[in-house]
Amino acid sequence: MNAFFKITLVVLSIGHVGCVSAQALAKGLAPQVRVHGLMWDAHEVSVGQVRQFAQQTGFVSQAEKDRGGFIYEAGWTQKMGWTWRAPFGKLAQDNEPAVHLTFDEAQQMCRFQGKRLPKDHEWVKAAYLEQRDQPPTGFQKGQRYTYPNGQSAHKSHCLNGCGNYQGTAPQGALWRGIGHVPVMTTSPGVNGLFDMGGNVWEWVDTGQGSEKMTRGGSWWYDADRQIESDVATKPKDTRVGYIGFRCVQDN
């Protein structure tokens, strides 16, 4: 077990997960919640966590090697300098979700911590089926919800049909949308997890050949992309500004 993993395991009750500061994330500190026998990252992996990983391993992402990741602007457009460090061309804060990372890069970071990317069936069960014995008001054990935030997407972050949040993209940087919000900005949803719906898509370890699935929708899409039946697949070397990830740990 490496030093990075030792400082990332901070277990909180899934009934109450408080705010995590950028300073804590810069040190690799991030909360986990237990859902159906797995320890889940309560939020998407942050820029601060990736920064820790890069400092300890010398990691350089494919987007960095290529001098920039991609965004869709009436066609895929490469953006020079847009990487996990600067997702919209401006240096990110440590508490922003890490994007512009491929499936293999995400899996590599999870495994470095003694974790892994979730399988699709694991992700779906955690996102839509409430499993807490005593969930807070608004959730009921055993109920399957339409959205990861409950019966509506109003407390998540997306293009239309979600909450009123301010994205981190500089004005004029994007052809569409306002970018992601820092992790744990929105309200916790089913099972106490943050941003399983909206903010950024999340890689899951399911797919055939060079294709892998993403789940949950993102800031670039409307709320209807957050529902359980919406299944998206992408080439696993995709590195764009609205796909991130979270890790799980087997008990």
Locations of the language-model features?
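Extended beta-strand/loop cores of jelly-roll/beta-sandwich
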Residues: 2, 6, 11, 15, ...
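Functional-site microenvironments in short loops/helix caps that host divalent-cation chemistry
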Residues: 60, 71, 78-99, 103-232, ...
